[in-house]
């Protein structure tokens, strides 16, 4: 069983919760904490969480997931001391449970540990210790390789470490449409990499934005590449082998959502792991020297992307 090795925060005593106190309400507490985090209601979230807390020898995964949402909410509000406190509780409680059960044996434990590590890393960076943050996430990436949180950890590692570094070469197992440009063909170009999924509505909304950018800036040297991967299913969640999914992408999917002729689409699972794509779309902007200038999980508007691209074209 993988154990996290580098975490050492002696100032915080672990606060634990009774499983009996959470019977029938844990899942609803997780949902409530999530809603409050996104709403920016940090003080209310803390009051709700602490009102449910009682002493026990062992936390439940559900409780720790709720704690991790408290940490995320505090980080959204940039209340870093509070974020560190609850992220540490989520991590240390998760590590205690990992002595007795695998990480992916149920759905709440990966949420608790993954979010705890994410928040703690960004807290360290916000407090001015980026090296500590990168080391934390690098060790976690190694320790939890092959688990459901691997890509999430990689995403947050790259958020803190990829910008300003050379863009790694993509793998191409298969491709859609025209052959993707080779590394040599991309030299001297400004390249926007658009990591997407066929099931992703945000990706479909992003495509017209990319089309507009291509039309505006292609003659100045902008290239757009759209990596994707096999997901194991086709329309409506129907299970599919890679061969069946590729046929679907080239057939029924392309008939409804044509693959743009201006965007090469390499297909490889390793690209999504290597670039930490747990959010689709993920956008990576690379300058003419092959250096990453922006790593952005999530979509961006035409105006936001144009403001990033135009200085690189000068």
Report the location of each language-model feature.
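Conserved redox-active cysteine motifs that mediate thiol-disulfide chemistry
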Residues: 195-212, 233
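Flexible helix-coil transition and linker loops at the boundaries of alpha-helical arrays
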Residues: 53-62, 93-110
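N-proximal helix/coil linker or "cap" segments that precede and/or mark the start of modular domains
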Residues: 130-173, 184-187, 251
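Thiol-/selenol-based redox modules, centered on thioredoxin-like
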Residues: 280, 284-314
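Conserved helix-turn-beta segment immediately C-terminal to the redox Cys motif
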Residues: 189-190, 205-229
């Amino acid at each position: 069983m993988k154990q996290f090795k580098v975490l050492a925060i002696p100032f915080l005593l672990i606060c634990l919760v009774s499983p009996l106190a959470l019977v029938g309400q844990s899942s609803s507490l997780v949902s409530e904490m999530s809603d409050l985090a996104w709403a920016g209601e940090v003080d209310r979230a803390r009051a709700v969480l602490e009102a449910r807390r009682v002493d026990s020898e062992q936390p439940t995964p559900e409780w720790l997931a709720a704690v991790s949402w408290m940490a995320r909410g505090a980080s959204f509000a940039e209340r870093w001391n509070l974020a560190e406190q609850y992220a540490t509780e989520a991590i240390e409680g998760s590590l205690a449970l990992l002595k007795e059960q695998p990480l992916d044996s149920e759905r709440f434990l990966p949420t608790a540990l993954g979010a705890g590590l994410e928040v703690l890393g960004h807290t360290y960076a916000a407090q001015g210790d980026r090296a500590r943050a990168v080391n934390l996430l690098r060790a976690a990436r190694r320790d939890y390789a092959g688990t459901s949180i691997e890509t999430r950890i990689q995403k947050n590692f790259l958020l803190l470490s990829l910008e300003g570094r050379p863009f790694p070469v993509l793998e191409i197992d298969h491709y859609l449409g025209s052959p993707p440009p080779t590394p040599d063909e991309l030299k001297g170009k400004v390249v926007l990499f658009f990591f997407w999924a066929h099931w992703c509505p945000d990706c479909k909304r992003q495509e017209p934005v990319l089309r507009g950018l291509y039309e505006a800036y292609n003659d100045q040297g902008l290239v757009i590449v759209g990596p994707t991967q096999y997901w194991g299913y086709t329309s409506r969640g129907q299970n599919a082998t890679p061969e069946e999914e590729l046929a679907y992408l080239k057939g029924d999917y392309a008939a409804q959502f044509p693959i743009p002729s201006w965007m090469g689409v390499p297909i490889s699972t390793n690209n999504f792991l290597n670039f930490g794509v747990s959010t689709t779309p993920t956008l990576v902007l690379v300058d003419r020297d092959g250096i990453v200038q922006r790593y952005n999980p999530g979509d961006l508007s035409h105006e936001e992307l144009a403001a990033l691209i135009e200085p690189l074209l000068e």
